Amino acid sequence: AMAAQAGGPVTAHDIDPGRMRDIPARAARAGAEITVQPAPQGVFDIVLCDAPCSGSGSWRRAPEAKWRLTEDRLAELCTMQDAVLDAAAPFVAYATCSLLAPENSARVAAFQDRHPGWVMDFDRQFTLQDGGDGFYLALLKRG
């Protein structure tokens, strides 16, 4: 909603359509308009990749999730994260609610290895000390 308030059109897509059900109502409450697309279409100036992740940044609110994460599941998530990044636009904001480096800085580094023309403009790990759940954000652009 914050991006929509900046004046440009905002389009939302999730592989699980159920996760997008409440987006228009939530955006309207925030004074914004967000178009929901069941399948991504067209070319976008920037893509926010809210990648599937372990959710380790929110384990303080759901500690049982910590015990469900296995090495195999982490590897599966990392593979999905790579696929999300590889399908990106000319400018990408990559985000997870994870504190785990394999899902964050390691994914960005692997992406840059696969796509050498990309540079990272911003990279930050937000922790509980920042006043919320754990979160990671990297801004990437074609060099």
Predicted region positions:
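S-adenosylmethionine
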Residues: 1-143
